[in-house]
Amino acid sequence: MPTAGKASWRELLRQGEHLLRRRARPDPCEDAGTDAFLLMQAAGGPDRSHYPLQKNDPCPPTLREKYLALLRRRAAGEPVQYILGEWEFMGLEFKVGPGVLIPRPETEQLAEQAIESLRGRPKCRVLELCGGSGCIAVSVAKALPAADITVLELSPDAMRYLRENIARHGVKNVTAIQGDALCPPPGIAGPYDAILSNPPYIASGELAHLQKEVQKEPVMALDGGGDGLKFYRGFNTIYPKMLAPGGLLLYETGEEQGEAVAALLQKAGLREVRILRDAYGQPRNVLGYAPEKP
């Protein structure tokens, strides 16, 4: 890195990107440029709106050292989201850190689909399973303020972030309950107008082959059992019967799991079962509806 006190922000940013690309081998940082900029900003550097005017300004030595420390953490494989302590989902900022699954852009499709499906039921009851940081529930609650939303989460670490994010966004219509989604506590009872989940769906044997950053996330939020379908099978015996007539069951799935999960929903008697593809054409969500009253 350049000599302390003499480097401009532009020089530091270029050096930071180089450091991430070089030290992240053999698992390279695909977004080295973006990560280097975000960490520079977190260290006290200019944001994107001010960078063009300030990029040639010298960086104070104290901020340079702070930036270097953040870069080293990222180069060692720590997710940039954990380093920053928050991440955006559906235009909202959520607190994240070790012990909770990081919100991902592809999961926004689940939240968007839920909101679209429930707009005609403004006072709906919604249950989310394996709620993690609360990004899905809070996003739905902000869009549907009259909805009554319950979030079930087992992990004590994730519950801390879940409750903090509920409070942070001031959504009074979201209730967090700690419990096992495969053995729901007594407070979980239908009928629900929608049941949503982004459950663990990575096959156990694949966990060791995940990217270094993903391996820093909690195993219990990733491990879906031998074939990745453990939670879908377990949910299938519990939650379809908790749906109100015409109620929605909506899951996120792995790219190779759509057909298997759709078959489970059909087996449970749901109708209009569909597999939804993401922006890249990959299967991403499976949904189905409870039968209407005869």
Regions found by a protein language model. Give the residues of each.
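Mobile active-site "lid"/loop adjacent to the S-adenosyl-L-methionine
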Residues: 201-231
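Non-catalytic accessory regions of SAM-dependent methyltransferases
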Residues: 1-48
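Conserved Class I SAM-dependent methyltransferase catalytic core
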Residues: 226-290
